[in-house]
Amino acid sequence: MLRRILTTSSVRNLTSSTQARVGIPFVIDNEGKGERTYDIYSRLLRDRIVCLMTPVDDFMASALIAQLLFLQSESSKKPIHMYINSPGGSVTAGLAIYDTMQMISAPVATWVIGQASSMGSLLLAAGEKGMRSALPNARIMVHQPSGGAQGTCSDIVIRAEEITRLKKRLNEIYVHHTGISYDEIERTLDRDRFMSAQEALKFGLVDKIEKHTGSMPTD
């Protein structure tokens, strides 16, 4: 039974891209005859809850993938709950998370709180059908991938072709998870498209809008 929450004065590096440093809360959990201290993310992991609360980069993706694989090894049937509040980021890092979500047999329920933009919106849509949720004031943004290139003309052409291939693949993934036609997905993603929770529901990115119930879903 959870008893107390402490705040540590130590700091941890949460993302390699922003080098953000914040104090990580610790909790004290009563277990049988004794107590055990966890950082808050480890404690949530015990309840099969993982958090994507930063830009998507290789460092964050590695940590999140490791958590998904660990929870899959613990139970291949119990749901995993992924909470998303992310502006997006690296396409390749996001696709690594996406492929892991699709590979494991444990269903992944996705929840957007705050925002799910760019790759964040794709990972939101990639949750188990019927288990993709938005909180009432969440914002979702979809768009096509972007990037730059420099060097010789040949190098620039190669890079442009790769971005075009990634754009096509991302469009196909959105089609698969939303049920919307490829042409409509391509038109929608041509520019930044911001959506409310209700608009994301209509678009097929989420299955429901959660009301504030005061309880946190677990397995």
Curated annotation (Swiss-Prot):
Residues 1-23 form a transit peptide. Its EC number is 3.4.21.92. The active site is at 118 (nucleophile), 143. One of its GO terms (cellular component) is endopeptidase Clp complex. It comes from the Eukaryota. Keywords: Hydrolase, Mitochondrion, Protease, Serine protease, Transit peptide. Pfam families: CLP_protease. It is found in: Mitochondrion matrix. GO terms for biological process: mitochondrial unfolded protein response; protein quality control for misfolded or incompletely synthesized proteins. InterPro entries: ClpP, ClpP/crotonase-like_dom_sf, ClpP/TepA, ClpP_His_AS, ClpP_Ser_AS. Tetradecamer that assembles into a two heptameric rings with a central cavity. Clp cleaves peptides in various proteins in a process that requires ATP hydrolysis. Clp may be responsible for a fairly general and central housekeeping function rather than for the degradation of specific substrates. Belongs to the peptidase S14 family. This is ATP-dependent Clp protease proteolytic subunit 1, mitochondrial. It comes from Caenorhabditis briggsae.
